[in-house]
């Protein structure tokens, strides 16, 4: 490869990396110092300066404030996107089966479309399936609960939490639902269904059933409630909002574990460090 070609390749790759980083910045933000970017991208100072100059000529404006650094005074994320090397932004989230998820789906779609970015959202049940898609490079981000995120990040250090949304952004609460409307607690010998691919349901089920002699049944998340309604199992951990809409008379009891239960109601966006 000729020297000029090698230099242009370095400029191009640095421009991709810088544009991807700038996608997370907004007006008023201070950008990293040149020396910091040189160390991060492992290229020369001149290469970073050339890439930054290209972005500033077409997509953003900086104000230099001496030793305080440079601040963004204007930025066109749609134009920045053109330099990222990315195509359509693809996210994945659960089916919007409750009011929290319906609102979240609308908010995410509206926000990204407002930025004029090419975008598609895939709706897919179970955090494990969504995270597997993220790890395989099929998705750029996935929506899971904070409870699921903790499990995913421990298992997959290449993932990172990009955004944590407010309380109630994922759902309102889970309950223990019983096929017997008079039942109020889990007991030895009960049949309990859960989806092993649903980190929330799995963790809450195991926690609630700890110390009890329980017969477990594995099935897709949405099938657990259907199975409960028709007497196939005695209990499931399910979203209170969805269980309350059941046309069958079900018993319901609160989950007596505040910490994991509270983490299950926060929505989190996970991304891969290897994608940026």
Where do the protein language model's features map onto the residues?
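Mid-protein regulatory/catalytic core that forms ligand/cofactor-binding pockets
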Residues: 89-204
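A ligand-binding cleft/hinge motif common to bilobed small-molecule-binding domains
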Residues: 143-156, 226-258
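Extreme N-terminal segment that seeds HTH/winged-HTH DNA-binding domains in transcriptional regulators
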Residues: 1-33
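Short helix-initiation/N-cap motifs at beta->coil->alpha
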Residues: 121-132, 215-229
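Periplasmic-binding protein-like
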Residues: 76-78, 163-179, 249-276
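Conserved hydrophobic residue
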Residues: 25-30, 60-61, 139, 233
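N-terminal helix-turn-helix
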Residues: 30-64
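Short, Lys/Arg-rich nucleic-acid/phosphate-binding segment
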Residues: 64-77
């Amino acid at each position: 490869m000729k020297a000029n070609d090698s230099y242009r390749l370095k400029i191009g790759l640095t421009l991709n990396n810088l544009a991807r980083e700038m996608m997370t910045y907004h007006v008023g933000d201070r950008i990293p110092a040149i020396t910091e970017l040189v160390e991060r991208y492992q290229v020369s100072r001149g290469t970073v300066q050339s890439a930054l100059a290209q972005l500033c000529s077409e997509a953003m404006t900086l104000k230099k404030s001496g030793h305080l650094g440079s601040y963004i005074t204007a930025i066109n994320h749609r134009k920045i996107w053109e330099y990222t090397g990315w195509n359509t932004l693809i996210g994945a989230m659960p089916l919007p089966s409750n009011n929290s998820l319906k609102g979240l789906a609308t908010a995410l779609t509206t926000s990204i479309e407002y930025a004029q970015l090419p975008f598609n959202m895939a709706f897919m049940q179970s955090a494990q399936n969504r995270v597997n898609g993220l790890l395989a490079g099929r998705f750029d981000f996935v929506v899971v609960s904070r409870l699921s995120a903790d499990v995913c990040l421990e298992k997959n250090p290449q993932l990172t939490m990009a955004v944590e949304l407010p309380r109630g952004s994922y759902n309102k609460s889970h309950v223990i639902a019983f096929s017997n409307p008079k039942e109020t607690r889990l007991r030895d010998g009960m049949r309990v269904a859960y989806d092993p691919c649903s980190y929330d349901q799995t963790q809450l089920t195991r926690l609630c059933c700890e110390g009890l002699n329980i017969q477990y049944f594995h099935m897709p998340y949405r099938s657990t409630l259907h199975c409960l309604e028709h007497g196939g199992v005695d209990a499931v951990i399910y979203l209170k909002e969805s269980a309350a809409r059941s046309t069958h008379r079900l018993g319901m009891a609160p989950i007596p574990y505040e910490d994991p239960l509270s983490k299950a109601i926060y929505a989190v966006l996970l991304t891969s460090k290897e994608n940026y």
